[in-house]
Amino acid sequence: MVGTNHLRERGNTSGKGWKVLRIMKNGNNIKFAALIATAAASSMALAGGNPFTGFSADVSTYNDGTSDWYVVDMYANFTSDDFAVLNVFNSDIGTNDGLGFNQNDLADAQGGSWKPSFSFDIAGVYDPMRDSYVTIGYGVGAAAALNQTALDPSFGTGLGANIPVGAGWFNLTPDNPQYASGGQLHIGHFAMNADRSGLETMSFAADIGFNLGPGTEVFFGDGSLEIAVPAPGALALLGLGGLAVRRRRA
């Protein structure tokens, strides 16, 4: 797993004071991004270091009784539970084979939706484990109807297997802040059929906005990950011990 992250204060969104390095391998949809600060650190960073420590992923397998699935759950990580995530934006998310992610939700007839509020658990019909969605901490399944995550216009229709480059999502009700728990907050769930030939990696890069709760100053960070997706032959090992590319929550 390869990852980078950094912090910046609101107001420094033009790129001034930051040197941007982005290496893209478009053919395989593998992307790396790094930003190097050349300006003075923010007062927040000086006071307590960088509170946003990057993105991380849990990789697991799931069997729905018929098929095996690879599941990647993405998290935003912080140094404490005092921070609430407002939005994730400017994303670049995909798989090396370009086929994207599985959908299994209320919008199946339209190709499936990235809205978590569509990810219901209806036996024999819809299963959130094999559905792909983005979220700002809220739950799905029995909690889907209460999920207040909304998609940015940059998401387009919000339908289909792939996320448009630059897409974002946000907490529609920031007065109901979604604070980190155990130093992290769930921001996305990505399902892929384990029988897919040629699937090797998933890449995730995005910016994130966060604060200390309603009415407080907004800060921004970003990070990127390249996540190895195990080969089909690894399913037996995964079933025995599991595979994680981050330390699991207590």
Question: Can you annotate each of these PLM segments?
Answer:
Residues 230-246:
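A short, hydrophobic C-terminal helix/tail in secreted or cell-surface proteins
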